[in-house]
Amino acid sequence: MNTKEPHKRLVQGKVISKFAEKSAVILVERKVVHEKYRKIVKKFKKYTIHDENNQVKVGDFVSAIECRPLSKTKSFTLKEILVVGV
């Protein structure tokens, strides 16, 4: 039997808020080319992530991986802290 591991999204961003126990909000920036004007535009999106050990602080640059929905807004868990206190 050939079991395939499901593809999970990996996002990297800066922690902008630590509002509750085991939760944090990260801001992910991506660059896209504007369809009409062909200019590179920055787009931002906020993700609520699950931090099981309460180890992130505001300003850290972290990596998060997609998981099953943990609450209404949380679908990502902390994978690793890339840079402490950016």
From Swiss-Prot:
Domain of life (superkingdom): Bacteria
A single cellular component GO annotation: cytosolic small ribosomal subunit
Gene Ontology BP, a term: translation
Stored CDD domains: Ribosomal_uS17 (cd00364)
InterPro entries (UniProt xref): NA-bd_OB-fold (IPR012340), Ribosomal_uS17 (IPR000266), Ribosomal_uS17_bact/chlr (IPR019984), Ribosomal_uS17_CS (IPR019979)
Molecular function in Gene Ontology: rRNA binding; structural constituent of ribosome
Pfam families: Ribosomal_S17 (PF00366)
Keywords assigned by UniProt, alphabetized: Ribonucleoprotein, Ribosomal protein, RNA-binding, rRNA-binding
SUPFAM superfamilies: Nucleic acid-binding proteins
KW RNA-binding (keyword) present: yes
Protein family (similarity comment): Belongs to the universal ribosomal protein uS17 family.
UniProt cross-references to PANTHER family, sorted A to Z: 40S RIBOSOMAL PROTEIN S11 FAMILY MEMBER (PTHR10744), SMALL RIBOSOMAL SUBUNIT PROTEIN US17M (PTHR10744:SF1)
Subunit structure: Part of the 30S ribosomal subunit.
Function, as annotated: One of the primary rRNA binding proteins, it binds specifically to the 5'-end of 16S ribosomal RNA.
Name of protein: Small ribosomal subunit protein uS17
Taxon lineage: Bacteria, Pseudomonadati, Campylobacterota, Epsilonproteobacteria, Campylobacterales
